């Protein structure tokens, strides 16, 4: 990647803590969602968690994708299809088959769920391939970021158009990690101020799961939104 050097970094406990917090947030938000909490979309904790948790996951994924992006496009597609897509397929087949046998719930018993299940892994796969394709064509990070963001705009399936900016944010996070670490207090303070200022305007109905950015319809492939969302 032009203009950047790669640093041999040891495991950072900061990211382990960050991922643990994000996972706990997802679990709690899903409890509010699936346990029938009334008006969960307006619940303050649900609103707070859904304001940041999936962008955070994608930014962290972008951060850790930097070295994998040095593979060729074919190698990257092969490696990540095994690590990201195969679990989606196998988990979906097991869950749908099991549910059809025991009839535990009327959800997750349609094979169309294979399109939407574990959507985040599919979104990450597409983001990586789009970014790698753009990098292969341009050999320039800024141009690649712009091209992949434009490519992602019409791709609302798996919320790719929503997630792509955060994937690139994670890549920039990696390359400018020393600067970010030095300015962490200022960055966090500014981000917190913006969060507080924008909070009154934010609502659960504004999430990408309820109001996705769409330029065309893929209705035959759609799953039913937040009710079936995995995050």
Regions found by a protein language model. Give the residues of each.
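Alpha-helical transmembrane segments and their immediate juxtamembrane cytosolic regions
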Residues: 1-231
């Amino acid at each position: 990647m032009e203009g950047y050097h790669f640093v041999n970094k040891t495991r950072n406990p900061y990211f382990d803590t960050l991922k643990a917090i994000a996972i706990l947030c997802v679990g709690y938000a899903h409890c509010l969602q699936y346990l029938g909490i009334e008006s969960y979309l307006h619940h303050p904790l649900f609103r707070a968690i859904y304001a940041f948790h999936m962008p955070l996951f994608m930014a962290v994924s972008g951060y850790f994708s930097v070295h994998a992006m040095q593979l060729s496009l074919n190698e990257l597609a092969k490696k990540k299809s095994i690590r990201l897509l195969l679990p989606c397929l196998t988990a979906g087949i097991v869950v749908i088959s099991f549910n059809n046998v025991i009839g535990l719930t009327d959800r997750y018993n349609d094979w169309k769920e294979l399109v939407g299940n574990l959507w985040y892994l599919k979104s990450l796969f597409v983001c990586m391939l789009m970014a790698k394709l753009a990098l292969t064509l341009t050999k320039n990070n800024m141009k690649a970021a712009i091209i992949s963001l434009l490519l992602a705009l019409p791709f609302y399936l798996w919320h790719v158009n929503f997630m792509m900016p955060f994937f690139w944010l994670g890549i920039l996070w990696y390359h400018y990690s020393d600067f970010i670490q030095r300015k962490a207090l200022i960055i966090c303070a500014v981000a917190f101020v913006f969060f507080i200022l924008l909070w009154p305007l934010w609502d659960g109905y504004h999430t990408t799961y309820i109001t996705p950015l769409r330029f065309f319809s893929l209705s035959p492939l759609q799953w039913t939104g937040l009710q079936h969302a995995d995050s």
